[in-house]
UniProtKB/Swiss-Prot annotation:
GO CC terms of this entry: cytoplasm
Cysteines joined through disulfide linkages: none
Entries under PANTHER family matching the protein: PROTEIN-GLUTAMATE METHYLESTERASE/PROTEIN-GLUTAMINE GLUTAMINASE, PROTEIN-GLUTAMATE METHYLESTERASE_PROTEIN-GLUTAMINE GLUTAMINASE 1
Keywords assigned by UniProt, alphabetized: Hydrolase
Species of provenance: Borreliella burgdorferi (strain ATCC 35210 / DSM 4680 / CIP 102532 / B31)
Species classification: Bacteria, Pseudomonadati, Spirochaetota, Spirochaetia, Spirochaetales
Annotated EC: 3.1.1.61
Residue stretches making up the Response regulatory domain: 6-120
The protein's name in its UniProt record: Probable protein-glutamate methylesterase BB_0415
Annotated catalysed reactions: [protein]-L-glutamate 5-O-methyl ester + H2O = L-glutamyl-[protein] + methanol + H(+)
Single Gene Ontology MF annotation: protein-glutamate methylesterase activity
Length: 375
């Protein structure tokens, strides 16, 4: 018999806890193993039951439970959490605190029933990832990989490799000579594509980026209405300015632009300046905004003046299009398996030989500084 994905539910009202539990248990692949009325009880049950995925319904009556997102990270960073709420502001806050998926529901009694398919699909996706992570987890190997990566990036005179952590990719080398060659190049723009696990990953790297960096355009898979607040929250953490994309805006050094939810983002070049072009239209690779759309535009317009980075995420959005940037002469980087919450998009990009360098999240900015900052 197939093992079911275990779910912990956090919901303030007992009646609604029962409704949500019944909804989840209606799936033959899911099983509610524990419920909690607040974050205090949830913390205890998390330790006891060790679920594969958590569903939190966040509303104004339990707003303090937002702190559970931070508490959960200190207890077990590998357990994904899906947040539902009828409050847009709370959804935005949850995104900034590292929720893995966000589902806006209505305020009526059947709010979760209406979004049943989306909720179940999200729990199945993240629960499956959690199970795979448990199986693959080897703390000794992980420690060795990070120690090796740390040695590589902190010993410039003896850089023999920037890591090959995926069996299908060729080992990438970056020595002093190659760094010097990269330093001679002029990079005008950095493009980042990220999905599941992105809010936490971006919160980790963006505060390290100096104002001297070229403009950064980021596609984080988020629906319409979420990205403005997400950008504001990141802006409060960073030296650079972080904002949501605006159509026809000129890209500036020291800025990061979060692609507006519900729209695709491209770039164009007018009078020597890169400008943002926001577009409506159908979903591409299952997403709007699509990483693939941005990367194709970067390949066509910025060409060898671009650095493209593909990070944690499910699926293949951007995985093939980043190869267009490589073919155009741009520099391509992928987040490694060990530091990716979901090693989907980077894995496919690596398999298809679309990546120049593979690095841990904790060393991403160190690599960029080595290339972009003259010393």
């Amino acid at each position: 018999m197939e093992t079911k994905i275990s779910v912990l539910i956090i919901e303030y009202f007992a009646v609604k806890r029962k409704l949500i539990s019944d909804l989840i248990n209606s799936s033959p692949k899911l099983q509610v193993i524990a419920t909690a009325s607040n974050s205090k009880f949830a913390t205890n049950k998390l330790k006891k039951h060790k679920p594969e995925v958590i569903l939190m319904n966040l509303e104004e009556n339990n707003i303090k439970d937002i702190l559970f997102l931070e508490e959960k990270n200190s207890l077990n960073k590998t357990i994904p959490i899906v947040v539902t709420s009828s409050n847009q502001n709370l959804i935005n806050i949850a995104a900034s605190k590292g929720a893995d998926d966000l589902i806006l529901v209505s305020k009526n009694k059947k709010s979760h029933e209406i979004k049943k398919e989306q909720i179940i699909n999200s729990l199945l996706a993240y629960g499956s990832i959690s199970i795979k992570n448990k199986i693959a987890c080897n703390k000794d190997m992980k420690t060795k990989n990070y120690e090796r990566a740390n040695f590589i990036l902190n010993h410039k005179n003896d850089i023999s490799s920037l890591n090959q952590l995926e069996e299908h990719a060729k080992e990438k080398t970056l020595n002093e000579k190659e760094i010097k060659k990269l330093k001679l190049r002029k990079f005008d723009i950095i493009a980042i594509g990220v999905s599941a696990g992105g809010p936490v990953a971006l919160k980790s790297i963006l505060p390290e980026i100096p104002e001297s960096f070229p403009p950064i355009i980021i596609v984080q898979h988020m629906p319409k209405g979420f990205t403005e607040e997400f950008a504001k929250n990141l802006n409060n953490l960073c030296k650079i300015s972080v904002k949501e994309t605006t159509n026809n805006e000129i890209l500036k050094q020291g800025y990061a632009y979060i692609s507006s939810g519900g729209y695709h983002t491209k770039i164009k070049k007018i009078d020597g300046n890169y400008q943002i072009k926001t577009l409506d239209g159908k979903h591409i690779n299952g997403h709007k905004p699509s990483i693939g759309v941005l990367f194709q535009s970067i390949a066509e317009i910025a060409k060898d003046k671009a650095i493209a980075i593909i990070m944690t995420g499910m699926g293949n959005d951007g995985s093939r299009e980043i190869g267009d940037i490589k073919k155009a002469g741009g520099l391509t980087i992928a987040q490694d398996k060990e530091s990716s919450m979901v090693f989907g998009m980077p894995k496919i990009a690596i398999k298809e030989n679309n990546i120049d360098y593979i690095v841990p999240l904790s060393h991403m900015v160190k690599l960029l500084k080595a290339i972009l900052i003259n010393s």
